[in-house]
Amino acid sequence: MSSTRGPREADECDVVVVGGGAAGLSLAHRLTATGDIAVTVVEPPDGPLRPPERTWCYWDRDADDLAEAVSASWSRLRVHGTDGRAITVETAPLRYHMVRSTHFERLVHTRLARAPGARVVRATADAVHDVHGGAEVHCSAADGPRLVLRARHVFDSRPLPALPPARTLLLQHFRGWFVRTAAARFDPAVADLMDFRVPQPRHGLAFGYVLPLAPDRALIEYTEFSRTALSTAAYEAALGHYGRDVLRLGAFTVEAAEQGVIPMTDARFPRRAGPAVFRIGTAGGATRPATGYTFAAVQRQSRAIAAALRDGHAVVPAPYGRRALAMDAVLLRALDTGRIDGPGFFTGLFRRTPPQRLLRFLDGESTPWEEWRIGLRTPVGPMLRTAVELPFLPRRTRPAPGTGPRHGESPR
């Protein structure tokens, strides 16, 4: 719904959630599950501020109460080294789930429509600021009317205009095609998480990514970890090479495409913007720095916020622990300096680490003992050198990339 109230009229509720992406809708869904919290979600109207359809992925034992939004899932993952050798791992009891943003939005909007005290406002959030007893969100609808929303707490998932100061910033940037082949070319039981059989850039690393949906349909992506994104033409050329010469798909058609950029950074993302204003999602640090994954952390964070509010507290827990962030900072710096070989590093992790332990590590839920054992299987010398120098490096402010996170606030 869109508001038609005048600019001075305030609409009051318990919580306002700014942004209708993965983070905003997940939080609204968790908050309204019991019906005792009045929630208003502010979503941008149709236009340039509304993101295109995206793909989000995460692993879990089951799809929880989001099963209706899951398009496909896999319990076997594969990584291809630069030498062409494949490593296939069984992830049971975990499964790798794929969610399309339109399916997720439809599911949550349906549930919000049934929840007492929940509503969705189609408007642009122009300003968010603290007031006595809470916070206000000043909005403007597409047809001109303005609305002031007042709440005890505001959770803002909008992208930051600039990234917080960081020592290292790489971009995970990609373009993907949803393809349909003339003949059966895919194994729907196995997802290719990283395929390093693509030409490697001079700086950083590149890999292919395949999520098979049927024997003749899949999402195939070309991804780089590097300092700068590519032109659309360059992604198209790389995808054409990957589909034609690496995957050997034969004749195929491209039914849809998606493209994104995710910051991979050791910046510290503040989760509080004021006494009653909190940041969630990527803006609140929910994107894992070394992988770009966001969706699982968003679900954990949303559940924790909802539980705290029902107990009378307003908190946004850290999406990842200090150990995970410290390890990510070392890895990002080692990749950026070229001290470690990216394809060799990730291929080695999958080759030498039990899959359940590795997935817990990638999701930030591993134990110190598991992390120690994984660390011993990495290039110890370059990683130690990087760990020693990190505390002495300055943090610099950089502009935020123009497209949101992969399978998190945008794909992956």
Regions found by a protein language model. Give the residues of each.
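Short FAD-binding loop at a beta-strand-to-alpha-helix junction that anchors the flavin cofactor
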Residues: 210, 215-216, 272-290
